């Protein structure tokens, strides 16, 4: 075992092995930083390709050690593929096969390190190799508790007939005892979850792997808080008959050497009045696949009349966002609108005083960043988990509005314009209601002791688990 001893101030030896995606590795590293801050030692397993991107985020290099793992070449994957960034979505199951094939190397590492704790989320076989060396296992989930409760608990199992896709009505059914009638999917939205139960040769379904991962661990951990998702966490705990530990949002805190907002954006935003700019960002993955959908988004923001900044990947078929812009758009919005295809410092933009509205896809990280900001929130979720996050924010917390869309999944420029104006125009009843509710939640979530309190409790849970 590690150097963890009889008193609670001793250091635990921890191994982290997240799914091979930056959207998973980064939150795992943020949690590693929180635990290292308390003196615990972490060995972080990751592909070689991920090292350069994650190394700068390691705040405690004396306590967090990166250990690169060789990702085997699996037939059907692009040459050299190591993370989900290298792989189209429809081949993700082959990346899971490659991860499964790292088991012998990971087992050797475990035997050498003899950790007290192992954190994982996808590699369901981790408990099988951790138990013989006496290590406790924690399945750490970086998605919302609501999405787990709806689709990744034993009661959510679906009978899948080979070769037959389930209907939207079948996919939209909530499992027995599911604790909400509001945070649900409509049949046409639920189709985006069909991949969860789809069977693949060699690895079965995503559902099988994830349920096995949570069923066999010693404890489940979720990156959320009881104030927002308590009833979903309790439901998950009952479904698996084991403890569910909550870490809180685990967002990176301000650091002494944290960079300031890129001068390009700081200077541009400074030209506008307080709270007048609409900021639109849809995360690091391509979201808007068709040029006509991309153009509807641009035209909808133009028609609001507000200044706007958009950070979005180009749609399919073009290499830059400029190629996809509507005819005459750039000239019409010059001076008040920018569409940018690169990476942008989202938390810093949200905290700029000129920004008053955030149009988001409602990924879980963006959800927390929006809640902790002072911006009005407009949501354009794209698939299952994001839609559930949006329903949590609009139907239960009532802090945001969701853009109305057609059954085929996209929205019109008019529906986007209406949603933005409903929260930004003075005297709007909807705008006043969501701002009032958002202010209450922001006060709770940004309280100086809120996040620290969750990490303190989480650490105590881990200490008790290791001692048990």
Swiss-Prot record:
Class of enzymatic activity (EC top level): transferase
SUPFAM superfamilies associated with the record: UDP-Glycosyltransferase/glycogen phosphorylase
E.C. code: 2.4.2.51
Pathway: Secondary metabolite biosynthesis; flavonoid biosynthesis
PROSITE patterns in the record: UDPGT
Ligand binding (UDP-alpha-D-xylose): 284, 344-346, 361-369, 383-386
Sample GO molecular function, one term: UDP-xylosyltransferase activity
Biological-process GO terms, alphabetical: anthocyanin-containing compound biosynthetic process; cellular response to cytokinin stimulus; cellular response to jasmonic acid stimulus; cyanidin 3-O-glucoside metabolic process; D-xylose metabolic process
Catalytic activity of the protein: an anthocyanidin 3-O-beta-D-glucoside + UDP-alpha-D-xylose = an anthocyanidin 3-O-beta-D-sambubioside + UDP + 2 H(+)
Disruption phenotype: Strong reduction in anthocyanin accumulation.
Protein function: Contributes to the last few anthocyanin biosynthetic steps. Converts cyanidin 3-O-glucoside to cyanidin 3-O-xylosyl(1->2)glucoside. Can use 3-O-glucosylated anthocyanidins/flavonols and uridine diphosphate (UDP)-xylose as substrates.
Family to which this protein belongs: Belongs to the UDP-glycosyltransferase family.
Name used for this protein in its record: Anthocyanidin 3-O-glucoside 2'''-O-xylosyltransferase
Natural source organism: Arabidopsis thaliana
Gene responsible for this protein: A3G2XYLT
